[in-house]
C-alpha cells in the first residue's frame, strides 16, 4: 500500500491538534496532506515565536531537539522532522547540514545552495544520492514516536521544475524521469522521504493507540448485538445532526449510526 493511502485510512489514529516544529510553509502543506485526519498547526500562526538551533550531529538529534523545544512552550502534541540530501560521491554531504550548506561562503538561498552543490559535482560520473527524513512525534510522557524515510535518486546537472522547495529541482527520480520539483504534491507524497517517514510514524502511532481503538470497536459490537437481540433488528438513536445539538450528542449519534450498520450486517448473517 502506498504511504499516502495508508495515512488516509489509518482510522485508529484519533484526531489531534499537532504543532509542527517549523515555520516552513512548504513543510506545513506536505504534512497537512500526509496527516489529513489531524490538524497541523504552525507556531507562527498561533502567535508563538519558535526557533531551534539544529546543531545535532544526526537527523534524529535535530528532530528531537526541535520537538523538545516546542513542546516546552505549547505542552501539546508536537511533530518535528529533520531532513537532508546525502550525495554518495561527497561521502554523504551535505547531509544534516543541507539547510546551512555553503553558509561559510555567504550562501543563504536554496538556489545558491543548489548551484554550489552542482559546481562541487561538476564532471563526476557517480551522481547517486538520497533524500533522508527522520520525523518524531512528541506526545508528552509517552516515548517518542519515530519514523525514518529514505528516497533514492540521482543528482541532475541543472535545475528543473518549479514545485517543492529546497533541493527538489536537482533531485531526479529515475523511474519517473522527473525531479521532485516537477511533481505535484499528491505525486510527491506517494514516493518522498517525508511521506515514508510519516508512514512509519503513523504505523507506530496506530500500534500505540490500538488498545483504545479495540475498546471502541468492542463497545460498538456490544451495541450492535443489543439491537439484534432475539433476532429482531431494533432501532437505535437518531443519527441526523440537529441545529443546536451539542458535540457530545453528535458523537453519540454518530456512534449509534455505526452500531446500526454493524447490527444490520449481524442481522443479515
Swiss-Prot record:
InterPro entries: dITP/XTP_pyrophosphatase (IPR020922), ITPase-like_fam (IPR029001), RdgB/HAM1 (IPR002637). The active site is at 82 (proton acceptor). Pfam families: Ham1p_like (PF01725). Mg(2+) binds at residue 82. The keyword Hydrolase applies. It catalyses: XTP + H2O = XMP + diphosphate + H(+); dITP + H2O = dIMP + diphosphate + H(+); ITP + H2O = IMP + diphosphate + H(+). PANTHER family: INOSINE TRIPHOSPHATE PYROPHOSPHATASE, INOSINE TRIPHOSPHATE PYROPHOSPHATASE/HAM1 PROTEIN. This is dITP/XTP pyrophosphatase. It comes from Treponema pallidum (strain Nichols).
Amino acid at each position: 500500500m502506498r504511504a499516502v493511502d495508508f495515512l488516509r485510512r489509518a482510522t485508529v489514529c484519533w484526531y489531534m491538534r499537532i504543532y509542527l516544529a517549523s515555520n516552513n510553509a512548504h513543510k506545513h502543506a506536505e504534512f497537512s496532506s500526509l496527516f489529513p485526519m489531524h490538524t497541523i498547526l504552525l507556531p507562527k500562526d498561533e502567535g508563538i515565536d519558535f526557533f531551534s538551533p539544529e546543531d545535532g550531529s544526526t537527523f534524529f538529534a535535530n528532530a528531537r531537539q526541535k520537538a523538545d523545544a516546542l513542546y516546552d512552550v505549547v505542552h501539546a502534541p508536537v511533530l518535528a522532522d529533520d531532513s537532508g540530501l546525502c550525495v554518495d560521491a561527497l561521502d554523504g554531504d551535505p547531509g544534516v547540514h543541507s539547510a546551512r550548506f555553503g553558509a561559510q561562503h555567504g550562501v543563504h538561498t536554496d538556489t545558491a545552495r543548489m548551484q554550489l552543490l552542482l559546481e562541487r559535482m561538476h564532471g563526476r560520473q557517480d551522481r547517486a544520492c538520497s533524500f533522508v527524513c527522520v520525523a518524531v512525534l512528541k506526545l508528552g510522557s509517552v516515548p517518542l514516536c519515530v519514523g525514518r524515510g529514505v528516497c533514492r535518486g540521482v543528482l541532475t546537472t541543472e535545475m528543473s521544475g518549479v514545485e517543492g522547495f529546497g533541493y527538489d529541482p536537482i533531485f531526479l527520480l529515475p523511474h519517473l524521469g522527473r525531479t521532485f520539483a516537477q511533481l505535484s504534491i499528491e505525486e510527491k507524497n506517494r514516493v518522498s522521504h517525508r511521506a515514508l517517514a510519516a508512514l512509519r510514524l503513523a504505523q507506530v502511532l496506530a500500534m500505540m493507540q490500538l488498545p483504545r481503538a479495540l475498546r471502541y470497536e468492542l463497545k460498538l459490537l456490544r451495541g450492535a448485538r443489543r439491537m439484534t437481540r432475539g433476532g429482531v433488528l431494533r432501532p437505535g438513536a437518531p443519527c441526523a445532526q440537529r441545529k443546536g445539538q451539542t458535540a457530545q450528542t453528535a458523537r453519540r449519534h454518530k456512534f449509534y449510526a455505526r452500531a446500526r450498520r454493524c447490527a444490520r450486517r449481524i442481522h443479515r448473517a
